[in-house]
C-alpha cells in the first residue's frame, strides 16, 4: 500500500494476523479474529484499539481559550482544568469541518483531538483563523494513542497504574503513569461503553499495547470500531457530518452554544435554527429483508426524501439498522419509508436513537 502512513503498532498488528486496509491515509487493522467477535468483546468484556492515526493539535497562549471558543460550536469557558468536551467545528456557512474532543489543561493550553482523515484540513482551517497571540502546534507525529473500551476497562487499566482511576470522571482526564509510561488518560471513547483513551510517546506504544495484551485484552480493528459507534449512534465524519451537513441537522444541537461569544458559523446556524430544520438524521430499523448502506435512497409517499448515512447489521442488537438524513415530513418516529436496495423499495421504520445505550 503506497504512501500510506503506519502507526508505531504496525508490526504488532502484523504479528497478530490483522487484516490491514487503507484508512484516511493510514494502513490500519480492520479486523484481527473477526468484527463480530471483537464487537462483542467490547460490549461485554474489554477490547483495545490502536487509534494512533488520530490528529492532535495543541493551542497555547494567553488567548488560547477564547480562540478555541471562536473555532468551535460548544463552550469551553465552562470547563475546569482536566475536563474534556465534545464539539463540532464549522465553516462560516454552518457546514461541518470536523467533530473533535477539546482537552483543557488551562485557559492558556488546549489539546484538540481530530479525525485522522481530516487532520490536514482541520489544521489549515485553524491556521487560517489563527489569532496573532495564539500558537498552534501539530503534535500528531509525536503522539500515539490506544483506546481501551468495555465494561472491564477500568478494572484492567487499574492493574497498570497506581493512580485511582475513579478520580477520572466521564469526560475528564489526568496525566498519569501507565505501566511506567507517562500518559494522558481520558475517560472517553467511541463505542458507547465505559473506557479510556490513552495518549503517549510513539516509542512507548508497543510496551503499553503488550502489557494490555498480556492482561487478556482483545485487540479490535476499525471494523468493530465502526459497528460499535454505529450502535451507539455516534456520528462519523463523511457520513452523519460533512461540509454539507450542519451539527443541527446531525442532531448535535446540544453541542452548539448560541449564548456564548461569536464563533465561526454562528450566524448561519442561528438562521437555520430560527427558520426551522428542513431535514435531520434519524434512526431506521429494516422491516423487510436487506442491509441499508451509505448513499441508498429513501422514499416516502412516492418521492425521494433522503439517503442512508450509515447502515449495517448491528451485531449486539442483531438487527439491520441505519442512520439516515431525511426531510422533516418523514422524520417522525414510527413513520414507515422505503429504502431502495438494488433497485427495489424495502420497508423500514423510523426509530429513536441511540440504538444502544449502556445499561439499558
UniProtKB/Swiss-Prot annotation:
Cellular component aspect of the GO annotation: cytosol; glycine cleavage complex
UniProt keyword Transferase present: yes
A GO MF label: aminomethyltransferase activity
Keyword Nuclease on entry: no
GO biological process, one term: glycine decarboxylation via glycine cleavage system
Entry EC number(s): 2.1.2.10
The reaction(s) this protein catalyses: N(6)-[(R)-S(8)-aminomethyldihydrolipoyl]-L-lysyl-[protein] + (6S)-5,6,7,8-tetrahydrofolate = N(6)-[(R)-dihydrolipoyl]-L-lysyl-[protein] + (6R)-5,10-methylene-5,6,7,8-tetrahydrofolate + NH4(+)
Key words of the record: Aminotransferase, Transferase
Role according to the record: The glycine cleavage system catalyzes the degradation of glycine.
Oligomer status and interactors: The glycine cleavage system is composed of four proteins: P, T, L and H.
Family annotation (PANTHER family): AMINOMETHYLTRANSFERASE (PTHR43757), AMINOMETHYLTRANSFERASE, MITOCHONDRIAL (PTHR43757:SF2)
Similarity section: Belongs to the GcvT family.
Protein name: Aminomethyltransferase
Organism of provenance: Carboxydothermus hydrogenoformans (strain ATCC BAA-161 / DSM 6008 / Z-2901)
